[in-house]
Amino acid sequence: MAKLNTPKGKLVRKLGVNIFGNPKFDRLLSKKGYGPGQHGKSGKRFSTYSVQLQEKQKIKFTYGMLEKQFRNYFEKASQMKGETGLNLLVMLESRLDNVIYKLGFAPTRPAARQLVSHGHFLVNNKKVN
């Protein structure tokens, strides 16, 4: 499984939201409220496509997924009955690594994902990775 090697601070400044939940990034956003790079963010208006893309990227980075995995979840959610966005959110929140993070067994989502992939948790008395 591939992972992102982008510095987290740069990613947080680019998105403008602390998606990792670390207080360090809250301080970073309060000190530097502009985007990364030499000139920061420009004052131009964003198109609807760019806003949708940025929201999708926030979700992907929050849950630590790549594009193909996210697309598969979206397709499953769109085939289910009900609202697609709500179904997608329910599916993402019910992933084992997210549940372990929410229960407090791991300090971060990537740490929870590592614990799951190393087989430290049993589901119905079977190792799950």
What are these regions (language model features)?
Residues 106-109:
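Beta-rich strand-turn-strand
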Residues 1-103, 126-129:
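Ferredoxin-like alpha/beta domains used as RNA- or RNAP-binding modules
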Residues 111-129:
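A contiguous pocket-lining binding segment that forms or flanks enzyme active sites
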